[in-house]
Amino acid sequence: MQSKADFIYQARPARVIFGAGSLHHLEREVVELGAERAIVLCTPEQRALAQDVIDRLGSRGAGIYDRATMHVPLEIARDARAFASSCGADCAIAIGGGSTVGLGKAIALESSLPILAIPTTYAGSEMTPIYGVTDGGIKRTGTDMRVLPKTVIYDPELTVTLPVELSVASGINAIAHAAEGLYANNANPVMSLIAEEGIRALAKGLPGVRRDGGDLRARSDALYGAWLCGMVLGNVGMALHHKLCHTLGGSFNLPHAQTHTVVLPHALAYNAAHAPDAMRRIARAIGADDAARGLYDLARDNGAPVALKVLGMKETDLDRAADLAVANPYWNPRPVEREALRVLLQYAFEGAPPRIYKT
């Protein structure tokens, strides 16, 4: 029989450059990867930022692909791979949030192209070997070490233009990684320490970002926390919360970070009685008496959404969402019961505070 002291910890290889102004080190880091021709991936909205990256690369810049979008549609992934091949690229730089990093991973999955990530949100995808592609309205995820970025540049200056409401939602999305990591079936003490510190840093930084989006100290706290929470996501398994969010995002096209923000308090309340130590750690990190209610209040008090209905979810789709979420068995500290899950989704739809969800 294993004791709580028995665990397996596998470090993930990644080079991290952190600090205000660290984008200045970009060309050095591309050289460090041995790359000669780098493409830059971005969303249409971040084309100007991608152009700045290309300008910094000089002759090493091979082109910009600006069609990254939520949930990585299969047709976009294929188009981006073809673009990389046509440019003769030997490196892809993903600048932006989880959508852009996700597109980089989709390219790396079949080409083994090294990825250099420059996050401008708190999504944390850059720290994980997890990829996802949406095909026919179904988001399919997997794990492959080839998709883990080789280098990550964290520059808090690049996050100051992220709208405050989206910043808070993106930060709580990051907290979700650490929160579920604390009760993962393969949790270990190393990741649990990192998870609690990541949650603490984000809970400290996000209210400061809400007060002043240009506060670099608050932005640094939030980005530091997001890095740590991303490490947790990349090292231990996830459970009900992430399954629900993948269902809502991939099948109903809800925005990623905001969906995590709405669902997290309810998923924690669902699992609370089956993961008491994790709940104590989360509550301690955010300075609250109750983990689920504390995260609900963190979102609400700082201008983030707390209801699925404001994200575009239709009440008539809640039954289908519950069916999809229980279609394929997965580990969770509490058995996933369809009726209780349907009640959870109703509360999340309405924006009601989390409660104990019984069958």
What are these regions (language model features)?
Residues 285-359:
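C-terminal charged capping/lid subdomain of soluble metabolic enzymes
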Residues 181, 185-294:
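Active-site segments that bind and position negatively charged phosphate/pyrophosphate groups
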Residues 15, 37-39, 63, 90-93, ...:
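Structural motif
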Residues 84-107, 111-122, 244:
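A short, small-residue-rich loop immediately preceding and capping a beta-strand
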